[in-house]
């Protein structure tokens, strides 16, 4: 290296850390860099607000089955209170729920149940003064009833219920007697997600203590490596909370058959199927072919089912 270059490097000043920070700061704006010291604290109003929020009790848990439009819900003025203002409007408020023990179960015993409301029937909603009565058929022939129930089992509107009820109807609908058909007809008037969870979830007493008390996002799918099958990235990433079966379906023969159908078809989803030595069933697969019900036998066809009677 030549002597002039060496002298130039020695004479060049070394930039300090403060000048480097200032120079980098000037690349993005004209505001000078201000380092935090002991005097840089929040204003008294901010500290008072933080202390007020920290001393408040947690907001009450309100399940999705509790309506906020009823008269017993807390109001702020003339309107219902938003969820984040419940503890401010009434710290002692306890929401009412038609399912006994649901709030205590979801909160892990942190919150007691409020006033017990009667279970909602089919077509009933909280906060309304009328009831949406299901459509009843009178004088319907047996083959026509089976064809209609098959259509209602296949056209639910969500994929889970479509697969569950269409495969169930393919196996059991042709074998049901008249009383079972009437019960299945009433069962199909229930909410789709309720039917799905009633059929696929075990009661909390029959499964492990790790059953979630509320809908939770898990990390199991990250630890177990790649998954195979449809929607592989979502397997094990979500566990739904337990939905209790209402008293009107506690001893239902149709619901028992539907649960048995899930156990026979389940590969890994049902808790009891995981312990099967045979490895469980092969899953629901696809929607089966349409059955055409005649008076004495069943014919399988591949064409689209026409509505015989609604």
Curated annotation (Swiss-Prot):
UniProt-annotated stretches for the region Disordered: 35-67
Record carries keyword Chaperone: yes
InterPro entries per UniProt: SDH, SDH_sf, SDHAF2
SUPFAM superfamilies membership: YgfY-like (SSF109910)
Major location category of this protein: mitochondrion
A biological-process GO annotation: protein-FAD linkage
Location(s), subcellular: Mitochondrion matrix
Key word Zinc-finger present: no
Composition bias, Basic and acidic residues: 35-48
Keyword annotations of the record: Chaperone, Mitochondrion
A cellular-component GO term for this protein: mitochondrial matrix
Polar residues bias (residue ranges): 52-67
Subunit (UniProt): Interacts with the flavoprotein subunit within the SDH catalytic dimer.
Function of the molecule: Plays an essential role in the assembly of succinate dehydrogenase (SDH), an enzyme complex (also referred to as respiratory complex II) that is a component of both the tricarboxylic acid (TCA) cycle and the mitochondrial electron transport chain, and which couples the oxidation of succinate to fumarate with the reduction of ubiquinone (coenzyme Q) to ubiquinol. Required for flavinylation (covalent attachment of FAD) of the flavoprotein subunit of the SDH catalytic dimer.
Misc. comment: This protein may be expected to contain an N-terminal transit peptide but none has been predicted.
Entry's family note: Belongs to the SDHAF2 family.
Protein name, per record: Succinate dehydrogenase assembly factor 2, mitochondrial
């Amino acid at each position: 290296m030549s002597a002039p270059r060496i002298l130039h490097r020695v004479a060049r000043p070394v930039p300090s850390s403060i000048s480097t920070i200032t120079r980098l700061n000037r690349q993005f704006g004209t505001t000078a860099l201000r380092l935090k010291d002991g005097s840089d604290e929040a204003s008294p109003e901010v500290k008072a607000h933080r202390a007020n929020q920290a001393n408040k009790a947690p907001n009450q848990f309100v399940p999705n089955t509790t309506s906020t439009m009823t008269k017993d819900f807390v109001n702020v003025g003339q309107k219902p209170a938003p969820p984040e203002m419940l503890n401010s409007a009434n710290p002692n408020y306890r929401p009412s729920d038609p399912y006994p023990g649901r709030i205590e179960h979801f909160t892990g015993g942190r919150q007691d149940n409020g006033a017990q409301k009667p279970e909602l029937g089919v077509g009933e909603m909280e906060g309304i003064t009328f009831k949406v009565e299901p459509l009843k058929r009178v004088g319907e022939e047996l083959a026509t009833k089976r064809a209609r129930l098959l259509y209602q089992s296949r056209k639910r509107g969500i994929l889970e219920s479509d697969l569950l009820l269409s495969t169930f109807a393919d196996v059991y609908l042709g074998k049901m007697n008249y009383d079972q058909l009437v019960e299945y007809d009433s069962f199909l008037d229930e909410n789709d997600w309720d039917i799905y969870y009633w059929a696929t979830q075990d009661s909390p007493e029959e499964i492990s203590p790790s059953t979630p008390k509320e809908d939770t996002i898990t990390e199991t799918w990250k630890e177990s490596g790649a998954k195979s099958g449809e929607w592989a990235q979502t397997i094990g990433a979500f566990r739904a909370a337990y939905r209790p079966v209402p008293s009107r379906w506690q001893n239902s023969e149709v619901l028992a058959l539907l649960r048995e159908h899930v156990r026979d078809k389940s590969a890994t989803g049902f808790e009891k199927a995981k312990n099967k030595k045979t490895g469980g069933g092969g899953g629901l697969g696809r929607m089966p072919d349409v059955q055409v019900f005649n008076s004495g036998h069943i014919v399988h066809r591949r064409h689209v089912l026409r509505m015989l009677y609604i």
